[in-house]
UniProtKB/Swiss-Prot annotation:
PANTHER family registered for this protein in UniProt: CELL WALL ASSEMBLY REGULATOR SMI1 (PTHR47432:SF1)
Lineage, broadest ranks: Eukaryota, Fungi, Dikarya, Ascomycota, Saccharomycotina
Biased composition (Polar residues): 346-361
Ranges of compositional bias, category Basic and acidic residues: 406-431, 575-584
Name by which UniProt lists this protein: KNR4/SMI1 homolog
Length: 584
């Protein structure tokens, strides 16, 4: 008798309720969605109004306040998307519109959440309060899935498919656990003995056929963008919503990775070792599909000869490029990849704009310090100073005012060379025996020119040797070297001026004793060289000429010393000027 009453109540319940997923139970709490095995539960106001094809009245029937506790992102996008989808399907493909089911009730959604032990996002709840997926696809030939061939599953199918993928995830977890235990058992067996190892291996062989999964191995799992989806083949918190009836799905991710977002829409399945994030929420995904329909990115393909089969299957084709028909899953993959690449470019641009430029860092080094940097390439530049060229080494774009540092040994060598050359000139002038006053008067000029040219040549040698790569020395060494050079040059000048009073006294004595005699002219040019003067010395043998030559020799020596002193003073002035510029 009780069984008969139960059947009658179930029959009455089926006619009096709008629930699709919820079933009759004699317990009133069960029918009101108060199951004990669910996750977090909230009081739900059951809606008893009849389904209506008008979306406006359906929006009023949806009670969003009953969906507290879940993110509300995407709800308005869902309502807007379904307006366009219903309008388009009723106009261009009525048979496809006829496959859309009536809305499910809040009690259905609550029972599904309790069975899955999850809390669905508000956007998905609002979508199923408008249409509970598609039905009667097999009975209606010439139709396909709503989303370019992808079928929108009913709430009952979603629960069943989720349970299947959870069983797959459980098997994979068991395999991973067994592999860990087997590796531990092998390591322990090596220490325990051969008998225990043989027994464990035989037990593993018996359990292996029972726990073996269909796939021989699981490839490496990835995601686009990286670290947005967990790198797993299957997960218990991935809720499939669309299916291609071949093991691939578009669903809701309720357990994202570190960079993911709760409720994001992902692609996963048997053909997707790389998971793709196609939208941030279900409302954005539905709205993108509606935009494709409004943009004309669609075709209706009818391969059947049956004229009563309907308008055909809905497929994707890009209207702008007028390209071929494309699989919508591949289109979504491409869009996800392009969005990821665009995000990378944006991040690179922001990073480049935030980093200081190379020019600014080099300018900062120039203004803050006076040190040479070994990391920069060194070049040489020439500047004019008092008629002489000084070759300076400078760093491009930075230390262009720093002169080249010269070693102390090089300066000492050049000073010794100039001193030796001046001594040689003095010796040559002593050996000269002039025969005429013209020679005596012209030779000092030639010697003056030679002596004046010697410091310039020495300076040129210094500047040439300055090209040696010595950029690492500090400016302080240069200051010390320049001071030493100045002191050496001053000491040489003082030594040359000591013999001037004695020469003047001897000159006056000789001039009073011996009168000067006329001397014949032998050369017309002023640039008299040393070998020619030596030949003239052989031709002068007279004794009076010897006395005259001694007086003139002293006179010439005096003039040469004066010229040398003047030239050395000029060099000292130039070096002191350089020293002042370096100090500045």
């Amino acid at each position: 008798m009780n069984l008969f009453r139960k059947k009658v109540k179930e029959w009455v319940y089926s006619f009096s309720t709008e629930d699709h997923y919820a079933e009759y139970n004699s317990n009133d709490q069960f029918n009101m969605g108060m199951r004990s095995q669910g996750a977090s539960h909230h009081d739900v106001e059951a809606h008893a109004q009849s389904a209506n094809d008008n979306i406006l009245s359906m929006e009023d029937d949806i009670d969003l306040d009953s969906m507290d506790g879940t993110p509300s992102e995407g709800v308005s996008e869902v309502l807007l998307a379904w307006r366009h989808i219903d309008t388009w399907t009723s106009e261009y493909n009525p048979d496809l519109n006829a496959t859309l089911s009536d809305p499910c009730t809040a009690n259905d959604i609550k029972h599904a959440e309790e069975d899955l032990e999850v809390v669905l996002p508000k956007a998905l709840k609002a979508s199923y309060r408008i249409h509970d997926g598609q039905e009667d696809l097999e009975s209606m030939t010439g139709t396909s899935g709503l989303i370019y061939g992808l079928q929108l599953m009913t709430l009952d199918e979603i629960v069943a498919m989720t349970q299947r993928w959870r069983s797959v995830a459980d098997k994979l977890n068991k395999q991973a656990t067994m592999s860990k235990h087997s590796s531990v058992g092998v390591s322990n067996g090596s220490s325990m003995g051969s008998t225990a190892s043989i027994g464990s291996s035989s037990q593993q062989q018996r359990e292996k056929p029972r726990n073996k999964f269909k796939l021989p191995y699981i490839p490496e799992q990835k995601s686009i963008p990286p670290e947005t989806v967990l790198p797993l083949y299957a997960h218990a918190m991935w809720i499939p919503v669309l299916t291609d009836n071949a093991g691939n799905h578009i669903g809701i991710d309720l357990s994202p990775a570190r960079l993911g977002k709760h409720g994001q829409v992902i692609m996963f399945g048997r053909d997707f070792d790389t998971k793709y994030v196609v939208a941030e929420n279900w409302g954005d995904f539905l709205l993108s599909f509606a935009n494709d329909l409004e943009a004309g990115n669609w075709l209706l393909v009818d391969d059947s000869d049956d004229y009563l089969a309907g308008e055909g299957e809905l497929v994707f084709r890009d209207k702008k490029s007028n390209g071929p028909i494309q699989d919508y899953l591949e289109v979504l993959k491409k869009r996800s990849w392009n969005k990821y690449q665009e995000q990378l470019r944006t991040n690179q641009e922001t990073m480049q704009s935030g980093e200081p430029t190379l020019t600014s860092t080099r300018t900062h080094k120039k203004t803050s310090s006076f040190e040479l940097d070994d990391d920069f390439d060194h070049t040489t530049t020439t500047t004019e100073h008092n008629g002489n060229e000084f070759i300076e080494s400078s760093v491009p774009e930075t230390n262009s005012d720093i002169p080249q540092i010269v070693k102390k040994e090089e300066l000492d060598e050049t000073a010794e060379e100039t001193k030796e050359e001046s001594n040689e000139l003095d010796v040559k002038t002593e050996e000269i025996a002039p025969e005429s006053t013209q020679i005596i008067e012209e030779t000092p000029e030639t010697k003056e020119e030679e002596v004046s040219e010697q410091p310039e040549e020495a300076v040129a040698e210094v500047t040439v040797d300055a090209n040696i790569e010595e950029p690492e020395q500090q400016v302080e060494e240069q200051e010390v070297l320049l001071e030493n050079e100045v002191t050496d040059s001053v000491n040489n000048a003082d030594a040359n001026t000591e013999a001037v009073p004695e020469v003047e006294e001897k000159k006056t004595e000789i001039e009073t004793e011996t009168p000067a005699e006329p001397i014949e002219e032998e050369e017309e040019s002023t640039n008299v060289e040393a070998p020619q003067v030596e030949e003239e010395e052989d031709s002068t043998t007279a004794e009076p000429a010897e006395t005259v030559s001694k007086s003139k020799k002293k006179k010439n020596k005096k003039k040469n010393k004066k010229k040398n002193k003047a030239n050395q003073d000029d060099n000292v002035n130039e070096l002191s000027h350089d020293f002042e510029t370096v100090q500045l």
